UniProtKB/Swiss-Prot annotation:
Enzyme Commission no: 1.14.-.-
Residue ranges crossing the lipid bilayer per the database entry: 1-21
Membrane topology recorded in Swiss-Prot or TrEMBL: Single-pass membrane protein
Binding site for heme: C444
Cofactor(s) of this protein: heme
Designated gene of the protein: CYP71B17
GO cellular component, one term: membrane
Similarity comment: family membership: Belongs to the cytochrome P450 family.
Species the sequence originates in: Arabidopsis thaliana (Mouse-ear cress)
Gene3D superfamilies according to UniProt: Cytochrome P450
Protein name: Cytochrome P450 71B17
Length: 502
């Protein structure tokens, strides 16, 4: 009896949905859609790497495309012009976030910044982060930490260079980014404290990203608890909760350590600043911080802080290893500009190596850390490229597809940093063909901090070392296969042999 009623409900719901869609399409000029199946819509056309699936569909359907993922309509943007309309022209109306299961859980009910819907609370949190944690004065105070950690990296790589053994650069560069982040945020040295198990931290970061970007049935079949039931049966609820508990244990340990009255307060890190604000806030203060807010914001800082540096360094070294002429060119510039026999690299050296900046831009173009940025949700009716997008509609901007658009880029699949010579295109959110940090109100607030880690790390790798392939490998053997959802990592770890330059 119950099954019969459920089937009757689904048939009725689907029928009404089809009728409703036809009425809406006759009133509105909705974006084109690829053919879909009953109930699941276009879900069967989305593979393990959604950004690649969406580009293939957009090539046949259009650069403003309406997909039906289960019962949920999603607009996918795949052109520079459409992205500019969403992120600049209609930024205010398109800058909220959808209520998704994974992001709601990991953000503790939207007590973070990245996944919180747009509103006064979000504005206060962003104002706090930009004004207190990512201001110029704070960023300058973090530079010394970055330089010290890069020096430690050079020392460890030099030890590996003695016996000419391959180094897992994927692990090494994750360790560098995590080490810098842990000192800046937690005041703890990654390699001199209990946080020495990089594999566990790496695993936790990847699991957290997967949880935040996961395709759960509850998000696409929200009617009558059907999606929730499927997620429960499949174990998705348990997987998400396990990640949350592991992340919470780490953050609680850090907060407990900072709350210890005997702890030295000579140098205030990010957690110290947040706890001070929480303890001193008054009941009439516009910014309200609780322990959950601190944990939510720290989650954003950890994930984004490690990813921007580590993943982009890994992809950059991958492309340079695959293109030895470009590797030679960028190393030649670095060593000519900085001179011989340098013992350390400093922040002042970053402005002396313009070709390295072009290499980084080209890496951002081919390998944006978050290929679909973060999902947006409309707060009002807007028109994009002449198409109607109603309120409460999810929007995904395919930055990865835009970065490989043959209408914008010559030889779009090739790694050619020279394409940016004399080009005004930059990555700070004003040029919509290159969007590694997003744009508009939702642009990444930690962009400057992430760039400093990335630039210093690469400068040290390329100045102090030449890089050889392991025995038996050729440059063509280095693959660029991807893995991930919200962010995309190199699936097969990059392993190279460091050769210390005298």
């Amino acid at each position: 009896m119950a099954i019969s009623l459920l089937c009757l409900f689904l048939i009725t719901f689907v029928s009404l949905t089809i009728v409703g869609c036809k009425i809406k399409r006759s009133i509105w000029n909705l974006p084109p859609s690829p053919p879909k199946l009953p109930v699941i819509g276009n879900l069967h056309q989305v593979g393990e790497l959604p950004h690649r699936s969406f580009r293939r569909l957009a090539e046949r359907t259009g650069h403003v495309m309406l997909l039906h993922l289960g019962f949920v309509p999603v607009t996918v943007i795949s052109s520079r012009e459409a992205a500019e309309e969403v992120l600049r022209t209609h930024d205010l109306d398109c800058c909220s976030r959808p209520n998704l299961v994974g992001s709601r859980l990991i953000s503790r009910g939207f007590k973070d910044l990245n996944f919180t819907p747009y509103g006064e609370e979000w504005k206060e949190r962003r104002r706090f982060l930009v004004g207190e944690l990512f201001c110029s004065k704070k960023l300058q105070s973090f530079i010394y930490i970055k330089e010290v950690e890069c020096n430690f990296l050079v020392k460890k790589l030099s030890e590996s260079a003695v016996d000419q053994s391959p180094v897992d650069l994927s692990k090494t560069l994750f360790w560098l980014a995590a080490s810098i982040l842990f000192r800046v945020a937690f005041g703890q040295s990654f390699h001199e404290s209990e946080f020495t198990d990089t594999d566990k931290i790496d695993e936790l970061v990847f699991e957290t990203e997967t949880a935040q970007g996961s395709f759960t049935c509850s998000d696409f079949f929200p009617i009558a608890g059907l999606g929730w039931l499927v997620d429960w049966i499949s174990g998705q609820h348990k997987r998400l909760n396990d990640v949350f508990l592991k992340l919470d244990a780490l953050l609680q340990h850090v907060i407990d350590d900072h709350s210890n009255p005997g702890r030295s307060k000579d140098h205030k890190d990010i957690v110290d600043v947040m706890l001070d604000v929480m303890h001193k806030q008054g009941k009439d203060d516009s910014l309200r911080l609780t322990i959950d807010h601190i944990k939510g914001l720290l989650t954003n800082i950890i994930i984004a802080g490690i990813d921007t540096g580590a993943l982009t360094m890994i992809w950059t070294m991958t492309e340079l290893a695959r293109n030895p002429e470009i590797m030679k060119k960028v190393q030649g510039e670095i060593r000519d500009r900085l001179g011989n026999n340098r013992e350390r690299i400093t922040k002042e050296d970053l402005d002396k190596v313009p070709f390295l900046n072009l290499v980084i831009k080209e890496t951002f173009r081919l390998h944006p850390v978050a290929p679909l940025l973060l999902p947006r949700e409309t707060m009002a009716h807007v028109k994009v490229q002449g198409y109607d997008i109603p309120p409460k509609r999810r929007i995904l901007v395919n930055a990865w597809a835009i970065g490989r658009d043959p209408k914008l880029w010559t030889d779009p699949e090739e790694f050619k940093p020279e394409r940016f010579i004399d080009s005004p295109v930059d990555y700070r959110g004003q040029h919509f063909e290159l969007l590694p940090f997003g744009s508009g109100r939702r642009i990444c607030p930690g962009m400057a901090m992430g760039m400093a880690t990335l630039e210093l790390g690469l400068l040290n790798l390329l100045y102090f070392f030449d890089w050889k392939l392991p025995d038996g490998m050729s440059h063509k053997d280095i693959d660029t296969e991807e893995a991930g959802t919200l962010t995309v990592v190199k699936k097969v770890h990059l392993k190279l042999v460091p050769v210390r330059v005298p």
